[in-house]
Structure formats: C-alpha cells, structure tokens
Amino acid sequence: MKRSLQALYCQLLSFLLTLALTKALVLAVHEPSPRESLQTLPSGSPPGTMVTAPHSPTRLSSVLTLNPTPDGPSSQAAATLETTVSHPEGHPPTDTTSTVMGTAAVPHPESPLPTGSPPAAMTTTPSHSESLPPGDATPTTTLPTKPAGTTSRPTVAPRATTRRPPRPPGSSRKGAGGSTRTLTPVPGGHLARKESQRGRNQSSAHLGPKRPLGKIFQIYKGNFTGSAEPDPSALTPRTPLGGYFSSTQPQTVSPATAPRSTSRVPPTTSLVPVKDKPGFIRSNQGSGPILTSPGGEPAATAATGAPASTQPAPVPSQSPHGDVQDSASHSDSWLAVTPDTDRPTSASSGVFTAATGPTQAAFDATVSAPSPGIPQGPSATPQAPTRPSGVSESTVSPAEEEAEASPTTTDRGPRPLSTVLSTATGNFLNRLVPAGTWKPGTVANISHVAEGDKPQHRATICLSKMDIAWVIVAISVPISSCSVLLTVCCMRRKKKTANPENNLSYWNNAITMDYFNRHAVELPREIQSLETSEDQLSEPRSPANGDYRDTGMVLVNPFCQETLFVGNDQVSEI
C-alpha cells in the first residue's frame, strides 16, 4: 500500500511539472507579435488610395495615392505620399518628425515652360538646426505646387490625419483651419524667402513649437499630412516615394542628376518655390531641366521622365532598412526623385526602378544615414549635385548620370544587409502593379505592402500542434521514468534490514544446544576407596542388575563436575 502511494505521488509531481512547462511554452509561442495591418478606405475615397496602418505604436505609416487623370494634350499623374504617426497615449512625443510627400512632373516637349511656379519645389524637415553656407544646396523632399483654383480630393488617413488642400503658386502652407496666406510673387529671392518663412511660421503653429525665425521652414512634430498635385499641363511619371526612413539622425538623399559642380549638403537649410526668372534654361531632349536662380544658388529642381505616350507603372516602395530600436525615435526623411529616361533597370539596395513600356523611367533615390555616434558635419553628409545657371541638361554624359545615380551609403548605421536586399529585390522590383488595377474600397494588389517590414520584426517561434505534443512527451517521459526508478530503489533499500535468523549457522548451533540440554549422557566410572582397594583388586565383582549400593562404585555425571560422594552406601544419581 505504501509503495503504491509513493509511486502515485511521484507521478503526480511529474505531471504537474510537465503541465507547468507546457503552459510556459504555449504562452511563449502564442505571444502576440507586432504585425502590420491593412485598412480599407470607404467608398468615397479617391481611386488608387492605399492606407497602411502602423505596425508599432510609434512607427510611421504610409498613405500612397495614385490619381491618373488625363487632360487634353497634356496629362498629369500625382503620386502623393502621406506619413502619419500614431501613439497609444493620444499625443505624439516631441522628438518625432515625419514629413515625406512629393510628385515629379514634366511638361510635354511641345508645350512651353509654365510661366507660374515651377512644377516642383524643394523643402526640408530637419530635426537639428545648423547654419548653411551661401553656396550649398540641399536635396530634400519634393513638394509639387499647383495653380490657384484647383482642389484636391480628400484622403482618409489613420488616426486624426488631415489632408491639406493644395496651395497656389507662391502661397504658404495651409493650416488645419483652412486659413490661407497668399503671397505675391516677388522677383527677389531674399524677399520671397522672408514671406514664405512668415507664412509657414503662422500656418504651422498648431503642429508643434516654433523654431527660431532664422530658418526657412519649421520642424513639424507629430502627425503631418500633405497633399499636392502638379501643374495640369505637365505629365507626371510617378512612383510612390519611400514610406519612411527611421533613424536617430537625419537622413539625406542626393538626387540622381549629373553635376558639373558639386557642393556639400548640410542637413538643415530648406529651399523655397522659385518664381519664373530669366535665368532658367530648359532642354527638350534632356532627362530634366535644372531650375536655378540668377545668383547661382540652386532653388528648385523639376523632375522629368517619360514622354506623354508612356503609361508609368507605380512601384509600391517601403523603407529598405530600419531598426526596431531606432523606429521609436527621430524619423526625418529627405528625399529627392529624379527620373532618367532610357535607362536599364538595376537592382540595388536603395535604388528603385520601374519599367514603363517602351521607355524606362528609373527613379533613383540614394539614402545616407549617419550613425548615432558621429556628429553631423561635412564629413557625414553626401555630395549633392548642383549646376550653375545657364547649363543645359543635354550636355551631361550618360556615364556621369550613372555614376551620380549610384547610392551613397557612407557613415551608414549598423543595419542588416539581408533585410535591405530582400526588401529591395522581393518587394520593389518583382512586384510591378499596373496603374489601372487599383480600385477604391478594395485591398487588391496591396497585400505585399505588409511583407516589406517583416524582416524588421524579431524572430518568432512558430510551432504546430504536433510539435507541442512532441515537446510535452519529451519532457514528461524522462521525469516520470526517473520518479518510478527512484521510488523502487528506496523501497528496496528499506526492506534490507539485519536479521540473524537468515543465517544457517545460527540454526545449527541452536539445535545442537537444545539436544544436549534435553538428553543427558551417563558415563560409567569406578571409584574405589582406600580400604577396599585391595579386596576389589583381588576379588573383582560387578553389581547384579545395576545395583551399586553395596559396592564401592560411584556414578559420575559428566555434566556436573566436582561432585563426588565417597561411601559404601551413598550413590550419586542423576
């Protein structure tokens, strides 16, 4: 009975231990890992709108809108990228910056250069304030301008994201309340910068604290959304820009245009929309005109691409690199897109290409992210190509363009190369979606957007039911077997006690002593006295019928020593 109870007790302990280990394993396996979710816009959204929800509380989400609208002899297409930040506390932190949006526009070779503002202007959203030498240029996010009177369609973005209506040429950025401050085009660049700075300081008061007035644009913190469309008389071979580039330091992107003279790019100064000036030179056969001010300072760059007969194919792009630890901190994106015609597609980390039928428009974006430990300086920033006024695009050789289009990755922070290569080759080059297949209210052709950031997550353990069962068996069987063996060994040791009855010699000695104690042995012995010794010797006689009373013989018991009775009439008896 005791043995069975002990065995049951050991088995119960082993079962409880196995159950506890199984629960811990199941909780570790089924722990919810961060995943990216897709949201479907309502039916009232414009066609070609895609919204990607953030996969972490402080990660940025990308909203890409593709609106191809043919218009007469000229056609326009806008690729607007909106970035939003969602936070679980309800208010964004003060160290998060997100501003990425832009389009690329090119007029027909037959159409004249627009007299209003150029198709695209350059702006920046830095996170650090530094000074800029007068001769330096900054490649930044391309913000297209739009003529007055044109409206943009609203786009539903996740969590308190507002769509900014487009602004007319020379106007400042509009605030959330819809107030517009229109500025008259000024020939002088200094006055235009001052007016633009004043307008942007007033319109960006609701988005974050004001910075010193010495800079052209404010740093927009928290949720930021921008919408812009190019000039209706321009064709836009477009591609969705990079969603976001997360890093603890500002990132700069050099445009892929071949320079005659280059200058360093500090990560601060912004450029304002440039008015029509006599110093602008345009080339019909080049890959893109460079708009410069008469003083020699580059003010804007108009990106050009394929002719009007080409139907561009959008390539949904995402961040080719990004650390999970760095995603919750600063996120500054400086991006410049420059399409080149008749260029073969190339697969490289940081270079995204899109084939558009007979003509290939390659939008090359090169990213350079300084490491957190290196201070921001001229040595940590890439070279940005600039061009003096009066230089035509057609004079640039293709070899220089190819050399300049290569990605500049100096002082890049530590990031896995496999993530960059797999993201660039698997999701940006091999998944070319036609522009006309995106419909409102559906999530078709955008399932691969959530796959781009999967390598950034931590490695999760995926076990099936059979795997869990095998793990349980492998843990429980050794424990139960060991418990049974220990129980049996302990019970056998308790049985082996010292018992003399098991010895055979003990019983032999006991039997012998008992026999001699119960059965006496009589040994006859003759004792003669001194008086009758001679008579007995002369006349020996034996008692008749064993009567030794009248004789001088003495019976001696061998077991009783030192007992002698000497006499004729005394006989010792047993």
From Swiss-Prot:
<dbReference type="GO" id="GO:1904115">
    <property type="term" value="C:axon cytoplasm"/>
</dbReference>
<feature type="region of interest" description="Disordered">
    <location>
        <begin position="32"/>
        <end position="352"/>
    </location>
</feature>
<dbReference type="InterPro" id="IPR031508">
    <property type="entry name" value="TMEM108"/>
</dbReference>
<feature type="region of interest" description="Disordered">
    <location>
        <begin position="364"/>
        <end position="417"/>
    </location>
</feature>
<keyword id="KW-0770">Synapse</keyword>
<dbReference type="GO" id="GO:0098839">
    <property type="term" value="C:postsynaptic density membrane"/>
</dbReference>
<keyword id="KW-0472">Membrane</keyword>
<dbReference type="GO" id="GO:0021542">
    <property type="term" value="P:dentate gyrus development"/>
</dbReference>
<feature type="compositionally biased region" description="Polar residues">
    <location>
        <begin position="58"/>
        <end position="86"/>
    </location>
</feature>
<feature type="region of interest" description="Interaction with DST (isoform 1)">
    <location>
        <begin position="173"/>
        <end position="406"/>
    </location>
</feature>
<dbReference type="GO" id="GO:0008090">
    <property type="term" value="P:retrograde axonal transport"/>
</dbReference>
<keyword id="KW-0967">Endosome</keyword>
<keyword id="KW-1133">Transmembrane helix</keyword>
<dbReference type="GO" id="GO:0030425">
    <property type="term" value="C:dendrite"/>
</dbReference>
<comment type="function">
    <text>Transmembrane protein required for proper cognitive functions. Involved in the development of dentate gyrus (DG) neuron circuitry, is necessary for AMPA receptors surface expression and proper excitatory postsynaptic currents of DG granule neurons. Regulates the organization and stability of the microtubule network of sensory neurons to allow axonal transport. Through the interaction with DST, mediates the docking of the dynein/dynactin motor complex to vesicle cargos for retrograde axonal transport. In hippocampal neurons, required for BDNF-dependent dendrite outgrowth.</text>
</comment>
<feature type="transmembrane region" description="Helical">
    <location>
        <begin position="468"/>
        <end position="488"/>
    </location>
</feature>
<feature type="region of interest" description="Interaction with SH3GL2">
    <location>
        <begin position="31"/>
        <end position="169"/>
    </location>
</feature>
<dbReference type="GO" id="GO:0031175">
    <property type="term" value="P:neuron projection development"/>
</dbReference>
<feature type="compositionally biased region" description="Polar residues">
    <location>
        <begin position="245"/>
        <end position="271"/>
    </location>
</feature>
<keyword id="KW-0812">Transmembrane</keyword>
<dbReference type="GO" id="GO:0098696">
    <property type="term" value="P:regulation of neurotransmitter receptor localization to postsynaptic specialization membrane"/>
</dbReference>
<keyword id="KW-0325">Glycoprotein</keyword>
<feature type="region of interest" description="Interaction with CYFIP2">
    <location>
        <begin position="489"/>
        <end position="574"/>
    </location>
</feature>
<protein>
    <recommendedName>
        <fullName>Transmembrane protein 108</fullName>
    </recommendedName>
</protein>
<dbReference type="GO" id="GO:0005769">
    <property type="term" value="C:early endosome"/>
</dbReference>
<dbReference type="Pfam" id="PF15759">
    <property type="entry name" value="TMEM108"/>
</dbReference>
<feature type="transmembrane region" description="Helical">
    <location>
        <begin position="9"/>
        <end position="29"/>
    </location>
</feature>
<comment type="subunit">
    <text>Interacts with DST (isoform 1). Interacts with SH3GL2. Interacts (via N-terminus) with CYFIP1 and CYFIP2; the interactions associate TMEM108 with the WAVE1 complex.</text>
</comment>
<dbReference type="GO" id="GO:0098978">
    <property type="term" value="C:glutamatergic synapse"/>
</dbReference>
<dbReference type="GO" id="GO:0010008">
    <property type="term" value="C:endosome membrane"/>
</dbReference>
<dbReference type="GO" id="GO:0051388">
    <property type="term" value="P:positive regulation of neurotrophin TRK receptor signaling pathway"/>
</dbReference>
<dbReference type="GO" id="GO:0036477">
    <property type="term" value="C:somatodendritic compartment"/>
</dbReference>
<dbReference type="GO" id="GO:0030424">
    <property type="term" value="C:axon"/>
</dbReference>
<dbReference type="GO" id="GO:0097484">
    <property type="term" value="P:dendrite extension"/>
</dbReference>
<dbReference type="GO" id="GO:0014069">
    <property type="term" value="C:postsynaptic density"/>
</dbReference>
<dbReference type="GO" id="GO:0098815">
    <property type="term" value="P:modulation of excitatory postsynaptic potential"/>
</dbReference>
<dbReference type="GO" id="GO:0097106">
    <property type="term" value="P:postsynaptic density organization"/>
</dbReference>
<keyword id="KW-0966">Cell projection</keyword>
<feature type="compositionally biased region" description="Polar residues">
    <location>
        <begin position="316"/>
        <end position="332"/>
    </location>
</feature>
<feature type="compositionally biased region" description="Low complexity">
    <location>
        <begin position="132"/>
        <end position="160"/>
    </location>
</feature>
<dbReference type="GO" id="GO:1990416">
    <property type="term" value="P:cellular response to brain-derived neurotrophic factor stimulus"/>
</dbReference>
<feature type="compositionally biased region" description="Low complexity">
    <location>
        <begin position="292"/>
        <end position="312"/>
    </location>
</feature>
